[in-house]
């Protein structure tokens, strides 16, 4: 297709100047891993978010000296690693799977036995998202725990960013979306990023509504109630407390390591 100079000028006249000159990168939000296929080819960086609790636990683990985490989507894969002698954790529906010693509580990874070790982990939602996104150019882990350091790092990369919310069993949830909205709000505030999807706009406004009191805002959210019923209140408070670490876990050759 050849466009003549006169035709190009006509096109330019019909478009706003900002549409022609806009060189900003995109930051968008995907609510669930089930929707990822609609976004995957447009973004160089994918931020996987599972606030309650997988990505929070992963950040806590690296903050406490773990060497690497191998995320796997199924309990069967985690069990195979355990049989080979690996420290292996498995969580389903908020509880530790029978036969495993730990799940996805961030406090589990603060024990001395984890320092310098390579650990295998499978969870209901977070490791599924990591598996879905594994072929992206760059995959990093996001949570409230590393919110500021991650947002600043993303701003420096000059790449399109997708926040992939893990949700709950392929359904929307509030806490992941609010965290994604916080990242989106920061990146847009730099002037280097823009977003056009309604999911991103919704995430940003949810964040702005919740930012002064995450715990209070999420008191009636489905997953917070689910974990509260399992007596995991301390986990909830910890996971909703921002900026407790400066680590950014990144996926390299199938393993999460510290950036």
Q: Language-model features: where?
A:
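N-terminal amphipathic/basic-hydrophobic helices that include classical n-h-c signal peptides
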Residues: 1-20
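Residues that scaffold, gate, or flank divalent-cation-dependent active/transport sites
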Residues: 29-39, 54-66, 76-119, 123, ...
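Glycine-rich phosphate/diphosphate-binding loops that line cofactor/substrate pockets in enzymes
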Residues: 153-161
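Non-transmembrane, aqueous-exposed alpha-helical and coiled segments at domain scale
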Residues: 19-24, 29-51
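Phosphate/ribose-phosphate-bearing ligand recognition and processing surfaces
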Residues: 166-176
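Short, structured patches in soluble enzyme cores that scaffold and shape functional sites
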Residues: 123-125, 143, 163-167
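Long, charged alpha-helical interface segments
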Residues: 15, 101-128, 132-138, 152, ...
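Structural motif
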Residues: 26-28, 44-47, 67-70, 85-89, ...
